Amino acid sequence: MNQTRVFLIFAWLMVAALLWMEWGKEKAAANAPGAAATQSVPAARDLDAATPSAANVPAAQPIAQAGAPGTVPATSTTTATATATPAAAGAAPVVTLTSDVLRLKLDGRSVLDAELLQFPQTKDGTAPVSLLTEDAAHPYNATSGWASEHSPVPGVGGFRAEQPGTTFELAKGQNTLVVPFVWNGPNGVSIRRTFTLERGRYAISIKDEVINKSAAPWNGYVFRKLSRVPTILSRGMTNPDSFSFNGATWYSPQAGYERRAFKDYMDDGGLNRQITGGWIALLQHHFFTAWIPQNDQASLYVLNKDGPRDVAELRGPAFTVAPGQTATTEARLWVGPKLVSLIAKEDVKGLDRVIDYSRFSIMAIIGQGLFWVLSHLHSFLHNWGWAIVGLVVLLRLVLYPLSSAQYKSSAKMRKFQPRLAQLKERYGDDRVKYQQATMELFKKEKINPMGGCLPLLIQMPIFFALYWVLVESVELRQAPWLGWIQDLTARDPHFILPALNIAIMWATQKLTPTPGIDPMQAKMMQFMPLVFGAMMAFVPSGLVLYWVVNGGLNLLIQWWMIRQHGEKPSKIIRANAK
């Protein structure tokens, strides 16, 4: 297989993959339900009012000793009704908690709004990203509540801050902000909820203590959910947000990492599975929210829809709290960016998969390895653009033996091209005899006809994984390179890098030997630089920088290989010009 065919295979695979992704996005947009546009959406503060479905309420289990949680059965068929106690004086006031990285608005039961203070919405703007929001059209919040068959539980607005005031802020010199809330039920039952924010951390600790000072046992279970009306993204290669996975993901030690896109949310009948030691999350480009329960407590993991809203929920653990006893359950709520270093500090198995390099484990592992190298280069170079350049250089050095083997195979094929032409002329239209004679020649001269293609196939997973690393890494968001490139996740404003990419591809074509190429292939080759140039004009500049550096190094390697095998680059250029 000559260099031309190898290049065409790679080029058309790239085009086909991008067109396939584009077609899928357009089809999804065309078939997307219009519920968000046609149905009335309740106010954001009412989103958590619904209690879990009665068919899926886990039965409470007795506590062996004070503070020990019960287990959660897979699915309970017990008819359950939550007896929510209304707030004593209307809805609870909204309280604002502020750390150095988060500003939260909550009512004790739901986090209604969450701003990421270190991530502005735009490069030149000052407004931070709002991950959770009370937006009327697309509300998105996180809720933690209690449900029970017979015992009283707090309803919407049931929790009240123990301390006076509605604004609490992490002070300078402090590393922890602790804000307790309490619900005082009838007959001496109360639930004390404590929110803990830490400096530099996006995981919020939420601890519940059920204190039973009544004369009768109290039973109930905690539920934690993420509820969202998904935003319909503008589709196309010009919008990096639409490249990334948007939907629910969850993890269990048994099944590993799983995911469900918003557009396919209920295609497989939702989710209803008991899991211990997992987590559940909603993902979007660069950011995510997740409920992370205690590693030793079982929960029922549920995906369902509530009108226009997609819901990801944990139900359980369940408790039976004897008189005079206390039960405790704790969970973490992550509201923040997909920052590799901070996610690793949480020490949660599988949570690194929210950085969705691929749904396939092997591609995700390759992507994680590439980012590890990229981040170490950044720590040395202090610039993500130069880190991309350095990563490409390292990859080309590592893959140089494969590139060398590919060129050697192609050079050997060119050497025997006249003999192949003679065989074709000798056997004419007898394809069977021609193929037999060709294989005998390959065997005699020790030529591997796949030698030019195999190295490329080995390299392709690496380059595809690197593509997703550059798309997914929030570290590159709004990061500058130099000069006119001030945001590696935005397109090149002056189209300089796409123009360089066209020039490099054209030069590579001229330097690629093409003996025996047919006219159709020649015409296809002439248009490939323009096709790729048009595609690269509107994708993130970080990706184009990768292609330019990779193409430039490939051009230099091509020139070097030609010289190494005793050929003259000028002769090849003149031959291709004819």
Curated annotation (Swiss-Prot):
GO terms for molecular function: membrane insertase activity. The chain crosses the membrane at residues 6-26, 354-374, 380-400, 451-471, 495-515, 529-549. The keyword Protein transport applies. InterPro entries: Membr_insert_YidC, Membr_insert_YidC_N, YidC/ALB3/OXA1/COX18, YidC/Oxa/ALB_C, YidC_ALB_C, YidC_periplasmic_sf. It comes from the Bacteria. Pfam families: 60KD_IMP, YidC_periplas. GO terms for biological process: protein insertion into membrane; protein transport. Keywords: Cell inner membrane, Cell membrane, Chaperone, Membrane, Protein transport, Transmembrane, Transmembrane helix, Transport. Required for the insertion and/or proper folding and/or complex formation of integral membrane proteins into the membrane. Involved in integration of membrane proteins that insert both dependently and independently of the Sec translocase complex, as well as at least some lipoproteins. Aids folding of multispanning membrane proteins. This is Membrane protein insertase YidC. It comes from Xanthomonas oryzae pv. oryzae (strain MAFF 311018).
